[in-house]
Amino acid sequence: MNTTVSGLLLCLATFIGVHLSANPADAEELVRFESAPVKLSPFRIRKALEQGEILSQPQGTPLLGYLSRPAGDGPFPAVVILHGCDHLRLSVKELWPKRLVRWGYVVLVVDSFTTRKLADTCRSALPERVFDAYGALDFLSKSGFVDIRRVALMGFAAGDTAALDATKTDGNEQLMERKFRAAVAYYPACDADRGDPTVPTLIMTGERDNWSRAERCQKRLARLSDNAPPVELNVYKGIYHNFDAPEFMVGRRVLGHIEKYDADAAAKSMRSVYAFLRKYLAN
C-alpha cells in the first residue's frame, strides 16, 4: 500500500473514531446520584410529635449509574433500568440501553450493588431498590435533556419485582414528588396481593419459568380492580427465565432454576416493549 493511501486511511479512521466517540448516542457515561431518601410518613411524624421526639430526615444511599442518550438536545423520553439479582450482565448494561437509545430514549441503568458492596441478592431481597428507582428519576429531572413527564421504569427479574413495587397503589410512590409514566417487567416475581398498579404496565415471562412463575402474574391480573391502569401480560409458551438475554444461549441451571435464551421469544418481547413505550411515553 503506498504512502498516500495509507495516510488517507489513517485520517479516515481518526475522523470516524473521533466523531463516533463524540456522539452521545454511542457514549455511556458513569454517573453518581443518591437513592431517594425514605420519606417519613405524616402518621410517623405526627406520632413522633405526640411523644416529643424530633425526627431527622433519612439520607439517600450513594449509587452509581450508566447513562446513555440519543444525539441532540431533547428533551427526550427516558427509561430507568433496574438489573436483576445477578447484577449487571451484558444484556442489561449494554444491549438494552443501545436498543432503547436507537428507539429515541435516554437510558439510566441503576447499579444497586457496587456502593453497597453486594455481589448478588439471588438468595435474599433488597427492598431499598424502590428508592433507587426514584433516586434515578430525580437525577434525570435535573439533566435538562429529559422530559421528566415521560419516563418509564424497566426491570429484569428481581429488578422488575422492585419496579412493580415502585408502581403499586398504597406503596412508596405516594410519598414521591415525581412519578413514572409506565412500567415494563421482564419475568418478575408477581404477588397476587400487590394490588393495583399506578401506571400502565407490561409484564413478560416464560411459561416454563419456575423462578418467576406466570401463574402468579395471572392471579394478580385477575384481582385488579375495574379502575386499574391497563396491564398487559405476555406469557411465552415453552420459555424459561432470562429468555431475552443472549448470554444464556447455552441454558444453565441456577439455584434449581433454568435460565435459557430464546431468540423468537426475545424478538417478540422487544416488539412488545417498542409498541408499549411508543404508546405510553408519547407526547
Predicted regions and their residues:
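Alpha/beta-hydrolase fold nucleophile elbow
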Residues: V146-A157
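C-terminal catalytic histidine-bearing segment of alpha/beta-hydrolase fold enzymes
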Residues: P230-N283
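Alpha/beta-hydrolase active-site loop
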Residues: R123-G144, D165
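Short glycine-enriched nucleophile-adjacent loop
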Residues: D160-Q174
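Short alpha-helix in the alpha/beta-hydrolase fold that links the catalytic acid
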Residues: V199, R213-R223
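Short substrate-entry loop that stabilizes the transition state in hydrolases
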Residues: G74-F76, I81-A119, N210-A214
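N-terminal cap/lid segment of alpha/beta-hydrolase-fold proteins
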Residues: A25-D73
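Short beta-strand/loop motif that positions the catalytic acidic residue
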Residues: I203-T205
